[in-house]
């Protein structure tokens, strides 16, 4: 019964699980002998700070820790300078080593908001990839063909559309796969857009004649606040794990009611049965969606702060939106005198694009210092402004 329960929790929410029986054997061995096994997941620090999208993987790693897994949290400081082409329609711009190092430091500091330090080792893939050398790289590339690389859907589309694919993009999955050779773990986790790369690691373990082939688990990508694209800092649709309790709580309440269930499944500690019961209560009118969403916001905010700050965030939110008050912890943005209002809204993170800003203004969603503004061509003069889009998006803008 213990093994069955452990495997149910481990497999919850996963998209695909390759080598599940091997993991069952490892978990059973842990229960019988106390012998632990190795689990890894890699994160390229392409932007500073972790967000809730990252925590889908982190929480699964934490689950493995409870059932005998020692986690190797891999920071791809080498591969981040190249850029993962997975799902991309064009070549990514490389990051500088300085940018990557600064971003990696934030990951290193924040990962223990989820993982147990006792069973976590932080690794950097520059340690072995810097030492690979020309001969090592040639040996590595000899294990894969161009035809095999073109099995990837994103590469195939770009090739058929005569879009550029750089050689280094072909090399990226091999370098990521070589991480599996260097660390020789039992299991690797990744987002469902990473399946090809994870299987490359499995193949390379076999090619380098290691004594195991890692099991592979893929997990869903968490949609961001827009409910469409995956959560990303570059799309400004993210909830950061270091954001203030007030901001985190308010952002969670801003997701739509349908997306709420996705967040429950991927982020909540409630069992699937409990989530189904909540959903039934909403569908039958015995619970209001807002109250259920507040429960989720309180749980997640408590996890990354504490219960007192989460309760204070709820009070602050209720004051803002039931009493039409302005939040006290507004993000502050600076713009130049004469900046176009649509551009200001994008800079302040209130709109994704100037075209969306125009639409919001036409819809009457814009308020500046509590006054509704309908002028799409407005240019702000020197001063400080409280800018608001809709009921829940605020920013303080300083024009200088």
Swiss-Prot record:
Catalysed reaction, written as an equation: tRNA(Tyr) + L-tyrosine + ATP = L-tyrosyl-tRNA(Tyr) + AMP + diphosphate + H(+)
Residue positions binding ATP: 233
Any one of the GO BP annotations: tyrosyl-tRNA aminoacylation
SMART domains: S4 (SM00363)
Locus of motif 'HIGH' region: 45-54
A Pfam cross-reference name: tRNA-synt_1b
Ranges for domain S4 RNA-binding: 339-399
Statement: the UniProt record of this protein carries the keyword RNA-binding: yes
Tagged with keyword Phosphoprotein: no
Annotated S-S bridges: none
The protein's Enzyme Commission number: 6.1.1.1
Subunit structure of this chain's protein: Homodimer.
Function per UniProt: Catalyzes the attachment of tyrosine to tRNA(Tyr) in a two-step reaction: tyrosine is first activated by ATP to form Tyr-AMP and then transferred to the acceptor end of tRNA(Tyr).
HAMAP family, per the entry: Tyr_tRNA_synth_type2 (MF_02007)
Family: Belongs to the class-I aminoacyl-tRNA synthetase family. TyrS type 2 subfamily.
Protein name according to UniProt: Tyrosine--tRNA ligase
Designated gene of the protein: tyrS
């Amino acid at each position: 019964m213990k093994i069955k329960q452990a495997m149910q929790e481990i497999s919850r929410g996963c998209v695909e699980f390759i080598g599940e029986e091997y993991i069952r054997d490892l978990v059973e061995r842990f229960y019988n002998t106390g012998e632990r096994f190795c689990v890894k997941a890699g994160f390229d620090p392409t932007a500073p700070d972790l967000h809730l999208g990252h925590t889908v993987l982190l929480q699964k790693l934490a689950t493995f820790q409870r059932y005998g897994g020692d986690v190797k949290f891999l920071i791809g400081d080498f591969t981040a300078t190249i850029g993962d082409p997975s799902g991309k329609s064009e070549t990514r711009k490389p990051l500088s080593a300085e940018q990557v190092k600064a971003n990696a430091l934030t990951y290193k500091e924040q990962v223990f908001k989820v993982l147990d330090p006792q069973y976590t080792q932080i690794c950097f893939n520059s340690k072995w990839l810097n030492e690979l050398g020309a001969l090592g790289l040639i040996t590595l590339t000899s294990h894969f063909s161009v035809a095999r690389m073109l099995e990837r859907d994103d590469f195939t589309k770009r090739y058929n559309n005569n879009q550029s694919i750089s050689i280094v993009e072909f090399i990226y999955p091999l370098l990521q796969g070589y991480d599996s050779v260097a660390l020789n773990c039992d299991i690797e986790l990744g987002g469902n857009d990473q399946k090809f790369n994870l299987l490359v690691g499995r193949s390379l373990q076999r090619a380098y004649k290691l004594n195991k082939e890692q099991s592979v688990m893929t997990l869903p990508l968490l949609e961001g606040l827009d409910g469409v694209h995956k959560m990303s800092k570059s799309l400004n649709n993210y909830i950061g794990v270091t954001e203030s309790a007030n901001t985190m709580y308010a952002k969670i309440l801003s997701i739509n009611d349908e997306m709420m269930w996705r967040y429950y499944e991927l982020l909540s500690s409630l069992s699937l049965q409990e989530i189904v019961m909540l959903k039934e209560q909403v569908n039958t009118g015995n619970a209001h969606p807002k109250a259920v969403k507040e429960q989720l916001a309180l749980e997640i905010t408590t996890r990354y702060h504490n219960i007192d700050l989460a309760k204070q965030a709820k009070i602050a939110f209720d004051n803002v939106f039931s009493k039409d008050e302005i939040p006290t912890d507004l993000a502050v943005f600076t713009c130049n005198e004469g900046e176009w209002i649509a551009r200001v809204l994008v800079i302040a993170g209130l709109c994704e694009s100037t075209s969306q800003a125009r639409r919001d203004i036409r819809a009457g969603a814009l308020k500046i210092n509590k006054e509704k503004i309908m002028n799409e061509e407005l240019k702000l003069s020197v001063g400080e402004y409280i800018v608001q889009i809709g009921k829940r998006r605020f920013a303080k803008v300083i024009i200088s």
